[in-house]
Amino acid sequence: MKKLFAILLCVCMILSVVACAPATNNNGTTEPEKTEAEYKLGMGVVVSSASSKTGLAQIDATVAAVVTDKDGKIVAARIDVAQNKFDLTADFATEVAKTFETKMELGSRYGMEGKVDNDGNGVMKEWDAQAKAFETYVVGKTSAEVNSIELQEAGGHQIAVDKVLLDAGCSMQITDFIAAVVKACNDEQGMTFKTAETFTLGVAAKSTAAESTAATAEADGTIKLYSDFAANVVAGDKIIAAVNDAIQPNIAVNTLGEIVSAEFKGTKRELKEGYNMAAFGQSMDWNGDGKVLEWYLQSAEFSKFVVGKTAAEVEAMATKEVEGAGYIISADDALLTAGCTIQITAIKAVVAQAAKNAR
């Protein structure tokens, strides 16, 4: 009996050692155990109408998404630009209905490769390749370090001084890149998350001019180049952190195609209570709870709601139309009860796209 007990004890000890042993890969080498760490996802948007001129209304919106670690160092960064142009000399209805693509979406069709050699090293990469070089360059840096990237003037552009970045192929103007990344690092409304998994990061922008109005002899027109933005952290195929935002810049134009004025007060998240959605009160109380949250709070609830979902599941979220209002809101009681009763068609689309763009 004692011998049997001793044998069983030995077997248990062996199984215990095997169970506690580190995992090995197919090459027979030991893989280090993954430790859960805390990160923060932030997003920043920099908007300019400076390229607008007679015959052209233009909004350039540079968006950056970053993941920072507990020390505030960037572990991943993604950048894109919604460069939206409205030709004031073309057919108005055609311009209002057109589809906008971001610079990343355009890829080689953007047409920069081989054309701009600001630093004279003979390397002239496409815009997307240069942006990706900048994304890689800022990894490991803090917000302050990114903000301190040294610049030089070259051909009327503010480009990097550091040969590391120039030799990597990024020789285009990077002032808005820097500003957007710094904003993203300092995003007070970003989402904190913990994970031990390997993750990817995606950013997306969706734009429209559908709400624009044409100029008449009686009144100026307004070109409304509106954009929605989203940033997602994805592990496996599921979103583990999310942020979304939107801009509504307005450019007033006359019948001669001249720019009368341009107005942009900030992104909807930046405006907070200044966006004044809550002021509408009962008229926008789509869930009937007697209150209307400000836009940035509703946006945050949507971001929380999509955590754990795939891009396909976000796209498939059920919606319903508010009778008599034309608003398309969520049909999910959980999201409505949380206070997110804003129109979500554009938000759904851009959040799903950001998850698909994760790399």
Question: Which ranges hold each PLM region?
Answer:
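Positively charged n-region of N-terminal signal peptides that target proteins for export
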Residues: 1-8
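N-terminal cationic leader/targeting segments used for protein routing and processing
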Residues: 3, 26-28, 266
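Iron-sulfur (Fe-S) cluster-binding modules
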Residues: 4, 15, 73
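Hydrophobic core
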Residues: 9, 13-17
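Bacterial lipoprotein signal-peptidase II cleavage site
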Residues: 18-30
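Active-site- and interface-proximal helix/loop "cap" or "latch" segments in soluble metabolic
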Residues: 35-359
